[in-house]
Amino acid sequence: IPDDPGFYEKFYFTPGDLGFTPIDTSVGRLGVLVCWDQWYPEAARLMALAGAELLLYPTAIGWDPDDVQDEKNRQRDAWVLSHRGHAVANGVPVLSCNRVGHEASPLGASGINFWGNSHVLGPQGEFIAEAGTDPTLLVCEIDLQRSEHVRRIWPFLRDRRIDAYGDLLKRYID
C-alpha cells in the first residue's frame, strides 16, 4: 500500500490477508489485483499459478500536475510497461482500468491528475484496446484459448527455477 505524496493509503488501508485467489466469473477466472499490487510481479505470478485467466487491475494512478512532462511520461510508461511484463511473463491477458480527471488536494497542494490510459493487453503484451485521457468505455473480445498457445511457445511458467527462489521470501539477502 503506497505512502507517497498524494497517496497516503498506508494510513487508511491494511494489506489483505486472504492470499492471491482468482475469482470465478461468467467470463473466466479473474485475478483481481488492486492498485499498488500492480507493481509486484510476484502478485501477478501467484494469480497466474492459481489459475487466473485474466489479470484485472482497477486503479487510480496519476501524477502531480506540477511535474515536468518528461517525468509524467516516465511514470505512465513504467506503469504500462509493468502491465505488459505481467502479461508476457504469465501468458495471460491484462486489463487495467484507471481513473481520469483531476482531484484537488484538501491540503491546498496541486492535487492529482489521473492519467487514464486504461488498456487491454493480450498474453504477449500486445495492445488489444486502449483508452486515452477522457472517460472511455473499452469493449473488445479476448481469446482466452490463446493463452494456452502462448504458454506453449513461451513456457515461462513451466521453466521457472523454483529451486533457486527461496531468497524471495526474505526482505533482504544477507
Q: Where on the chain are the PLM-derived regions?
A:
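Generic alpha-helical secondary structure signal
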Residues: 77, 81, 145-148, 163
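Short, flexible loop segments at the rims of nucleotide/cofactor-binding pockets, characterized by
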Residues: 8-12, 31-35, 70-74
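Cysteine/selenocysteine-centered motifs that mediate thiol-based redox chemistry or coordinate metal-sulfur cofactors
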Residues: 15-50, 59, 148-174
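Short glycine-rich loop/turn motifs that provide flexible caps or phosphate-binding loops at active sites
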Residues: 5, 15, 27-30, 115, ...
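CN hydrolase (nitrilase-like) catalytic-core segments centered on the catalytic cysteine
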Residues: 38-138
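Active-site beta-strand termini and strand-to-loop segments that position acidic
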Residues: 23-26, 123, 142
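A short, polar/charged loop-to-alpha-helix boundary motif
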Residues: 1-14, 135-153
